[in-house]
Amino acid sequence: MDGLATPRPEVVFPSGEQRPALGLGTWRLGEDPARRASEVLALRQALDAGWRVIDSAEMYGNGGAEAVTGQALAEAQRAGLARGDVFVVSKVLPSHAGEQAMQAACEASLRRLGLDCIDLYLLHWRGAVPLAETVRGFEQLQRRGWIRLWGVSNFDLADMRELFEVPGGKACAANQVYYSLSQRGVEFDLLPWQRLHQMPLMAYSPFDQGALVDHPLLHAVAQRHRATPAQVALAWGLQQPGAMLLPKAGNALHLRHNWAAQELRLSADDLAELDRSFPSPRRKSPLAML
């Protein structure tokens, strides 16, 4: 890759806490016991390489992804990694978003993760439980010391505004949504609103389910920088203020390539060319979800 090393991008949470803008997603991990050892190894390699944000959920692999994450964290800590250096994110299902059900769900997640406290606990998507009750549940978990921060996922702007009207709702620390170079709908109103409130937008599927890595334009831009199309997709996202990207944990080669994307700085001409093929939205559209 061309160019000098650049500072690794970070995001700032409403509390002022700073964390890396590049983290690891764990969707599809923990689904097959036959892959357990290789998945734990991949996460261990990521932690050894410097990755410090891991995103999981009770839904992923029916708790299996949290178990894989927990085993990798335990092994890394035995090797000397400090717990406080890793920012662990998990999510509660909407069906568990009531006060009592959330306590049980969080306790189970903590057990699978092998942790005393989750750094950021998200409502995976909005369900039938009133937001006020969900916020009270998050606050109870904070008082117990089981979570540090709480947030939401797959919330559009109207949902965020409604959340902010709920007592305690303004303590929301983040919103995780589907966002990439080819899925830019949130730029119309949600992303600017979150920037205004200094609330990171956590982006899942930054390769748009792999579609971007096959796009001819990303191949052309990558060739100019002696990079890969995946690195171009990540570099674009990392240059969007307030965005934290969560590519899925893969094999060792993919981990190295994704990590190196932090060193790639796209030029103004690169960004303009990408904008022409993947323009920012001019009107409101329904929130994209996976």
Which stretches of residues belong to each language-model region?
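N-terminal binding-site loop/beta-alpha segment at the start of enzyme catalytic domains
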Residues: 1-84, 290
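Aromatic/hydrophobic pocket-lining residues that form the small-molecule binding cavity
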Residues: 39, 69, 102, 106, ...
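CE4/NodB-like, metal-dependent polysaccharide N-deacetylase domain
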Residues: 102-122, 140-144, 166
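Active-site mouth loops of central-metabolism enzymes
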Residues: 25-37, 90-100, 124
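A short, structured active-site edge motif that brings together acidic residues
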Residues: 82-96, 120-124, 154, 177-179
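Short acidic capping loops at alpha-helix termini that bridge into adjacent secondary structure
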Residues: 21, 55, 80-86, 116-120, ...
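Short, acidic/polar
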Residues: 33-47, 98-113, 160-161, 186
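Beta/alpha (TIM)-barrel catalytic core signal, keyed to glycine-rich beta->alpha loops juxtaposed to Asp/Glu
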Residues: 3, 126-290
